[in-house]
Amino acid sequence: MNAIDRARRLLSSDGATLSVVNGKRERIYYDRGVKSLTDVLDSNRALLGGASVADKLVGKAAAMLMISGGVAEVYGEVMSDGAVETFEKFGTKYSFGTRIQGITNRDGTAPCPMEQTVKYIDDPAVAEEAIKRTQKILKLRAQGGKMKKLGFGMMRLPLLSSDQKDIDFEQVNKMVDEFLLHGFEYFDTAWMYHEHTSEIVARECLVKRYPRECFKLATKLPVFSLTCAEDMQKIFDEQCKKCGVEYFDYYLLHNLNKGDYPAVQEYDAFAFARKLKAEGKIKHYGFSFHDTPQLLDRILTEHPDAEFVQLQINYLDWESEGVQSKNCWEVARKHNKPVIVMEPVKGGTLAKVPADAEGLFRAVRPDMSVPSWAIRFAAGLDGVFMVLSGMSNLEQLEDNMSFMERFRPLNAEERLTVNKVSGVIKGTGAIACTACRYCTENCPKNIPIPDYFSLYNLHLIEGKNGWSSQFNYYEALTADHGKASDCVKCGACEGHCPQHLKIRDLLEKVSGVFES
């Protein structure tokens, strides 16, 4: 009897799912799915090299693992088209009892998670790593419990250049992997982020690389872009295509404010969201909001069906007369609506604070990073179930995960320290920009407004004798963009600013510093 026939005979044992024959060595395994294969690869990899293997069910994922382990010949009682194509591509000898188109999950309701994992992978070694990551993540999900409060905001992704579309996909992949492996699962994107590229990044770095059950995905309907009711369906369909999904876990009407709420009413955007939910195309719907607590109260009163609200909340804006974080949060609590927090670090402003403010933090908790104070402040508020952080590199991600994996709210002393730091920052005269970049869309002079405001704020912190390194960065930016002094005062930017900043006046401040 040859080796593959011996493997087939062993597979007929009661409960056997996998058998391996390599010379005189024979092994039988009983785990379902690809677990037996990954276990062998981890504990006894040499057993597979040159082996003959029989398996109850062989899909592309199992085929990739067998090839990665160096299996010589495979028999599958049931084998998928993807497995056959994979074996033929790599020249692995195979045979089967029954051939099927594809493998579903154990409920028969969706594709097998492991098959989804390797769908776009052609390298067996890469496939092995991906399968093992997915196994770990699914094991975490199976443990249950509440969703962890840190959300991956896809608004400030790492870049390879100053071009907002020039995304560093390799670094984003690493960030997504680490985020999921640490038990986090919420990803937030939007139609216009990164100049309409963010949703595509979600598809390439998340959706194509992980089974759908590994993550929660949120995106937003750009109500400010609507010209008619029919636009809503067109945009939603395009979002599904860009993200590569059949449904969204959370869907938001984006940036409701006094200027755009009439369009929401005219086109009945909430009814559209209800329709999508009834069709199973979204799981939950709500809205993000940048305006007064009075308008928020009105919207929640008129649309009690909204399941959650996304608010800008951070310790600098908590008592702000413009943003009114505290008052808006209180309105959400009055209506018993769960809250998602955006801008907890205020676009990076609260990640780098003046030295005396940082000293206050260090005196109380020298082990905690400056941004951690801002995120913990927001995450500790009643009713907050998610805090979004627009992380731009792996280091920021790792820092955030370090204190959010086992979240602990601020204590009384820490809250007092935050209040003191807020006062110090306000005393510097920093511009309250969050770098959302909504203002840059229609600037006739191509002025990178958020970048200039960031340089201005850093200059306030670092500047000595009227000079700082930010002058060099300003000069570099002006080589390809309009200067702050090029502003023609058209005001197109100010109508789009969620912070209600007087951008035209502030650009004069910027030019006064960097162009004087």
Where are these regions (language model features)?
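Structural preference for beta-strand elements that scaffold enzyme active sites
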Residues: 52, 93, 147-151, 185-186, ...
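Distinct, well-ordered alpha-helical segments
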Residues: 197-208, 229-240, 244, 261-271, ...
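Beta/alpha (TIM)-barrel catalytic core signal, keyed to glycine-rich beta->alpha loops juxtaposed to Asp/Glu
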Residues: 256-434, 438-447, 451-454, 462-472, ...
